């Protein structure tokens, strides 16, 4: 297993608005020696949101819910978040926008997740983010793709 993931499990605390600096401090408090540069090398770039609103500080992403990505007849894309893929809350939105959709059923890379910054991620991308945020408990089998059952 990845050394960063092992250290993360040792902390046994949920991560919230973590920065490279805050992770270094937490790891140091538990006896690990590391630097911000070490954290940035170990944690994939996809796991960080650069906060243009906060002097370009990097914040660790967290996956917050399932989302489906739909193509609209006018060429735009619509992302609908929900408790789970095709959950009741998502279905209610689909009923309203149905006339504007190319298709109501999506699969593959169009079934994904959003992070706390409303960015859409495929199942594979979301698995990387959720793993490094300490959010995953594999329930469904795949270690490469995230399913909402793996989160909650």
Swiss-Prot record:
Query: Would you tell me the protein name for this molecule?
Result: Uncharacterized 17.8 kDa protein in arn-motA intergenic region
Please name the source species: Enterobacteria phage T4 (Bacteriophage T4)
């Amino acid at each position: 297993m990845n050394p960063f993931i092992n250290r993360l499990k040792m902390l046994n605390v949920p991560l919230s608005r973590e920065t490279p600096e805050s992770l270094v401090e937490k790891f140091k408090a538990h006896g690990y020696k590391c630097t911000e540069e070490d954290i940035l090398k170990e944690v994939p770039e996809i796991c960080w949101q650069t906060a243009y609103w906060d002097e370009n500080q990097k914040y660790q992403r967290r996956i917050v819910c399932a989302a489906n990505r739909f193509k609209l007849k006018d060429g735009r894309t619509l992302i609908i978040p929900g408790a789970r893929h095709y959950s009741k809350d998502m279905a209610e939105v689909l009923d309203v926008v149905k006339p504007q959709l190319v298709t109501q059923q999506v699969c593959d890379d169009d079934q994904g997740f959003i992070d706390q910054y409303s960015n859409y991620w495929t199942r594979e991308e979301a698995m990387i983010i959720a793993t490094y945020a300490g959010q995953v408990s594999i329930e469904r089998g795949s270690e490469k793709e995230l399913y909402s059952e793996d989160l909650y």
